[in-house]
Amino acid sequence: DRQIAKVAISGAGMIGRPGIAAKMFKTLADARINIQMISTSEVKVSCVIDESECDRELHLLSLAFDVDLDSQKEITSRQEPKNHPPVRGVALDTNQARIAIRHVPDTPGMAAQIFTLLAQKNISVDAIIQSQRCHIINDQPTRDIAFTVAQADAELACAVITELDRQINCGQVSGDKAIAKLSVVGAGMIGHPGVAAKFFASLAKENINIQMITTSEIKISCVIDETDGIKALQAVHEAFGLGGSEQIIIPA
């Protein structure tokens, strides 16, 4: 489908602050703009919407987050020199839990309701994925949404979503604490094709299944089974030649 556009908000200040994604989703919902896909990283939230709504949504988001779109600012590229490797580090996070919601009604406002309730309970959400595939359930288009939270927040998050499910009639709500998030990071991957393919191939070689994928310009993260965490970390280190003793500092 070429009649789509991606709108995104970004900023290091959103790390650990509940409600940023919910505010973006609510801005779209209030304008009756439907979200077709969602993808996030720690510092960025992206939504795919209808191309015809793009300019209007940019204006609304600029008002919601007090960003001046008319200001002329020089943006300096931070791409690393070409002789630097595209991936500078690999990180494994085993303190995550995955919450999945099946068959969320594909109407404006659903994502806003879900993540506003989580924010009201002071639950910070890390990765968010909304499937592109649309399921028709009882003549109602639906999509699946999955997200990760800290393990300490998993039970409360499940309870919040289960209560909401009674109101909006989603499908199954499930939680899984036995996961790990594996990430590769590096500013050199910008404009460097093949990084994701190498990352995924290294996991496939070890027969490790990927449950979720999130990306940004400088980071690719996969959610995998917790029992595969160390094996996956070692495989990705080897694939990108990061097994040496040299210490590399990765900017936040």
PLM features: what roles do these ranges have?
Residues 1-252:
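A conserved regulatory-domain signal marking ACT and ACT-like small-molecule sensing domains
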